[in-house]
Regions:
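Conserved acetyl-CoA-binding loop-helix of GNAT-fold acetyltransferases
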Residues: 95-109, 232, 238-251, 255, ...
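Conserved hydrophobic beta-strand within the GNAT/NAT acetyltransferase core sheet
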Residues: 118-121, 227, 261-265
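Conserved donor-binding loop and adjoining core beta-sheet/short helix segment
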Residues: 33-36, 43-104, 216-228, 233
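Acyl-donor-binding surface of acyltransferase catalytic domains
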Residues: 1-8, 78-82, 91-159, 289-291
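Conserved active-site alpha-helix within GNAT-family acetyltransferase domains
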Residues: 122-140, 239, 243, 267-285
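Flexible, substrate/cofactor-facing loop regions flanked by secondary structure
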Residues: 38-44, 157-225
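A short beta-loop-alpha structural element at the N-terminal edge
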Residues: 8-28, 162-174
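C-terminal "cap" of GNAT-fold acetyltransferases
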Residues: 143-161, 259, 264-270, 282, ...
Length: 298
């Protein structure tokens, strides 16, 4: 994992900001449970995974010992570079913008020079009152889709296509495929793919002539499935590989006797939306904006 780093900030508030340590785990959990405003980035990492890394800071009241009162926390991490996400944010007071601003200033004052973007996946309304003031701007929207049954639409796969469960040794190749297929903020690293491989409901790879050309992984919960990722090698897109992977995923859900499936996709990814709608997915009406901060080069 790569993290944004080097705390610094407003001279009147920066003295309250320090890097989070493993000793802050209990305070962080308290904030996540009891905080007025809480954000946790949804992926395969847990919030505690980022403790002790540069870019995860806390705002404290009292002295500088690990036992002082932690009033807020903010963690930013890149996995992989060059884009970072806001991984966790929590404050115990609704009037805590100044605290958040001090933590944000501390983090972005001296980011890892390889970080080109810091993005916030907005799942609640409260960050929208702060993001513009912190210097972020809206860059994308994620749409949610749902399918109430698990039937597959007719499709024609390319000759010789084979789909099977992914092997751990294939994950670095799949990470390279991610880098080729997506802009930085949406990519998974080999480490993130490993976490998905360990925890997912299904993780399938599509092969042509023995070489990976696409993959999907899914999660389950509440009696349903969630298609968490679908990636196809850019030069192979439009050849039926995504449809074949989707059909195989639906077959796996049926075998597990799941009921329905959800997925998310970017509003500007029209090709994926056409595929999902052809398979019977419909928009749920839920939309999630993405805001980003772009450090000034140099």
């Amino acid at each position: 994992m790569q993290m944004a780093n080097r705390p610094a900030g407003d001279p009147t508030l920066s003295r309250h900001v320090r890097r989070a340590t493993r000793a802050d785990a209990g305070a962080m959990q308290r904030l996540l449970r009891m905080g007025v405003y809480v954000h946790v980035h949804v992926d395969w990492h847990l919030p505690g995974d980022w403790l002790g890394t540069p870019g995860f800071v806390v705002y404290t009241r009292g002295d500088d010992s690990p036992g002082e009162r932690v009033a807020a926390c903010l963690g930013i991490g890149a996995d992989p570079l060059p884009a970072a996400w806001v991984r966790v944010a929590a404050v115990e007071s609704a009037a805590a913008f100044a605290q958040c601003e001090a933590m944000w200033t501390a983090i972005v004052a001296d980011l890892d020079p390889d970080i080109e973007e810091v993005a916030w996946f907005v799942t609640d309304n409260w960050p929208l009152h702060w993001l513009d003031r912190l210097g972020l701007e809206p860059v994308s929207t994620v749409l949610s889709f749902r399918k109430g049954d698990l039937t597959a639409a007719p499709y024609t796969p390319p000759p010789g296509l084979d789909i099977r469960p992914a092997l751990i040794e294939e994950l670095p190749l799949l990470a390279e495929m991610e880098a080729a297929a997506f802009e930085p903020r949406w990519r998974h690293s080999a480490q993130s793919l490993y976490l998905a491989w360990r925890q997912s409901l299904s993780f399938d790879v599509a092969l042509l002539d023995g070489q990976p050309v696409g993959f999907q992984f899914s999660t389950g919960g509440g009696g349903g499935a969630h298609l968490a990722r679908m990636t196809v090698q850019p030069e192979r897109q439009g050849q039926g590989i995504g449809a074949a992977l989707l059909a195989r995923a639906l077959e796996g859900y049926r075998q597990r006797k799941l009921r329905g499936v959800t997925l998310n996709t970017q509003a500007d990814n029209l090709a994926s939306q056409r595929l999902y709608e052809r398979f019977g997915f419909a928009p749920t009406g839920h939309e999630y904006p993405v805001w980003s901060y772009y450090p000034t080069p140099g």
